[in-house]
């Protein structure tokens, strides 16, 4: 089994996160047994890793230090992170490298499409770093990646996990017009924690973005996720759930925050599996089509299976909606 240190970034925080170098080390909590996972290394994992490297692609699985990488890559599931490995934001929780990104690689959409075809994916998740340096925040690049995948793998369903496109008018419309099957944008934490956890973002802007997706294309599934263990109160989480339902979000994910390095935001506590289960029950009662809530839940974990469940839920509810008209 992987130790606590196995799940921490092995590169110095000063290298990947220069803006955090001056920060004092934050306290660390020992992980409970329910957080521990097996270290990756299966032959199937190695095969996925080989395809990713051959196509010179970046995955959020690696960059964010996802604890589920061994399980997902063994199933040939990978979440591709486009537009480079360097983010223009500096969120207190995130392990993705920060700094000044390079120019966009115009060949990347085709390389991603080639990898999706080679892996034989039935469902793929595409995410990105924040690119505040680009006039459209990278929206056109998202659209080009979607088009390239559709061209090579027309039966593959596509899920995008986007940045907030803050102060990028028209960017959201470009991505929605490209017709992904699922549009995911994570709130990450409750409103009261944004200043300390996600200072470059705005809670109500992110909510409005999710609401706007449904206004632009009601057929798209919308999705959002948060982390627990950042010091939030239960009532704040329940309010966030209500906010997401008001924005007509279909699917919510809730997982445990894990501290990447001692320079990152401290883990306030490890939330028990029973508490995660209670949030799932409450979310279903509030009207989400689907809830995924557990310590190791991540946005892209079991994304393909979840998409199939989402479609089935919507189809099951359709006759009820028609009867009520």
UniProtKB/Swiss-Prot annotation:
| Annotated stretches, region: Disordered | 1-31
Q: Which Pfam families match?
A: Radical_SAM (PF04055)
What is the name attached to this protein's record? Answer: Lipoyl synthase
Q: Where in the cell is it found?
A: Cytoplasm
Tell me the cofactor note. Binds 2 [4Fe-4S] clusters per subunit. One cluster is coordinated with 3 cysteines and an exchangeable S-adenosyl-L-methionine.
* Ligand binding ([4Fe-4S] cluster 1): 61, 66, 72, 300
Task: Indicate whether Chloroplast appears among the record's keywords.
Answer: no
Residue span, Radical SAM core domain? 73-289
**Which positions does UniProt annotate for [4Fe-4S] cluster 2 binding?**
87, 91, 94
> What keywords does the record list, in alphabetical order?
4Fe-4S, Cytoplasm, Iron, Iron-sulfur, Metal-binding, S-adenosyl-L-methionine, Transferase
Main localization, broad class: cytoplasm
Pathway it works in: Protein modification; protein lipoylation via endogenous pathway; protein N(6)-(lipoyl)lysine from octanoyl-[acyl-carrier-protein]: step 2/2
